[in-house]
Amino acid sequence: AVSLEMWDAVEEALLAFSKDENVRVVILSGAGGKSFVSGADISKFESERGSKDAVDHYNARIKIVYNIIENFAKPTIAMINGYCIGGGLNLAACTDFRIVSDKSQFAMPAAKLALGYPFDAVKRLINAIGPAEARMLMFTAKRIDAPTALRLGFVQDVVAEDQLESRVMEVAEMIAQNAPLTVAAMKYISTQAMKTQPDSDGLKKCDEMVAACFASDDYIEGRQAFMEKRKPNFTGK
């Protein structure tokens, strides 16, 4: 379960990763092998969410972290092994894609706890699996298994538990070997493309990021590597 202190730690780590040029992919996972995130720490509801002011503070705090993950400039992967419940489902939906073990389970139990589920979280779930399936999951508060999550499109790969880490690392390494500027541009542009009406500043930045790819040293390196039939050595410059 996640407490307010843990959300603070996640934000701190992500800010450090964003500044580290050696970090090209960020993998989010749960410790202990039993869950990704099994939801908020109910034992701390009284202290962290026991009053309107406390609820407002908690929601504002975690919204910041969700937005940081969702808009993180570098690719993010959720490595899920076990329970992915409530806030964990929302957290996973903030990442670019999700690779899970076959023992993983998913649920949004807000309706069983009389919790409000905010607009941003509902929108992420709808973006991931569509409105009808999102409503089914939210209204019933039922759990679904990994194959069902794959069928719905919430997760992109399901593997045996003992193969999960190696599979995630395989995908992360494939991404890390590609041109960082191009990957960053594709991530930003795909985020803009999902908006109902992208703003003019966002579209301008899309054009600028594409132009930066063609003006980069990596573009020269990519062409040379292709002609020389070798793997390119991209630097992100």
Predicted features and spans:
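Crotonase-fold acyl-CoA enzyme core
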Residues: 68-181, 216, 221, 230
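C-terminal alpha-helix plus adjacent terminal tail
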Residues: 20-21, 33, 141-147, 162, ...
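A short acidic, glycine-rich active-site loop
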Residues: 47-60
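Terminal peptide-recognition signature
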Residues: 9-10, 28, 41, 75, ...
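Catalytic-core regions built around general acid/base machinery
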Residues: 13, 57, 61-72
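Short, active-site-adjacent cap segments at secondary-structure transitions
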Residues: 33-37, 84-86, 107, 190
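Conserved CoA-thioester-binding segment of acyl-CoA-metabolizing enzymes
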Residues: 1-29, 67
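Short, flexible, mixed-charge acidic loops at enzyme active sites
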Residues: 38-44, 201
